[in-house]
Amino acid sequence: MADVVLVEGLAVETVIGVYDWEREITQRLLVDLEMAWDNRVPAASDDVADALDYAAVSERVSQCLQALQPQLIETAAEAVATMLQQDFGVSWLRLTINKPGAVPAATSVGVRIERGQR
């Protein structure tokens, strides 16, 4: 399947980081998602019930990251990927989480993972 549903630039404010001062503040994460989804059914039915609800996906990603409050971006990525596959039945995904400002000389740092089969 070559169909992909996108969520790009999802901003999530959460506690994340390994330093004591980071545990006392929220920081912005930027999340990009590519999720395999057969779009032929919703295209034919024109019914949102047949589609991957990207608003619900976005809300759950935000909730997951805000509840988790991880130290590492890697931990955050694995938790989000697992949740999306379990809760939404996404067979394959590519997930990027960026933490802008984490390294002063860089625009952003982050991780990108792929899970599942296309």
Feature-to-residue mapping (PLM):
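N-terminal, polar/charged subdomain of small-to-medium soluble alpha/beta proteins
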Residues: 1-118
